[in-house]
Amino acid sequence: MLTMLRSRCRMLMRYLHVGIVMLSSLLVCTSPWIIMLRRIPDNASLWDYLHVYLGLVCTGLGILFLINNCLQGKWRQYFGWLVGDGMQLKQDIVGLVRGKFPIAGGKGLFSAIEGIGMLLLVATGLSGLIWFLFQGTATAIEWRGYHQLFAQAFIGFLVVHLLLAISHIIDFIRQ
């Protein structure tokens, strides 16, 4: 029974990235249609409700994704620079300045960018959650601002992440 549960958890973790990509894409693409300030309006549209509740789901998935990627010492791959282990990151940046494209994996530039992306995803979700919890108060407006700031940074990450994924695929095809 325990083995089956572990197996199902591993399977869930494999699909977590896909689920986050799909939900994030939907949330980002529909966000221009969202009209909320201090609280969910009385005449809220389907898009408003979808954004709020799918955002809450995405927040939970983002937290699970971050935890899963930080377990068993894997956090050092994404955040090694926090403990002074930035040699590969430094080499990647120096190589990039010299026109050499960094390799994917390890503790280099790509992994550091992915780590920052995970933090931005969770920050976007948590700021949205806090905005939701404080709706109807003056504090909600403040958290709306934080949510928008983190969301814009996360969108920037998505663009960079997509470009890096495409470059990785092109590099893979060349070899």
Where in this protein do the model-derived segments appear?
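Membrane-embedded alpha-helical bundles that constitute the cytochrome b-like, heme-associated redox core
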Residues: 1-175
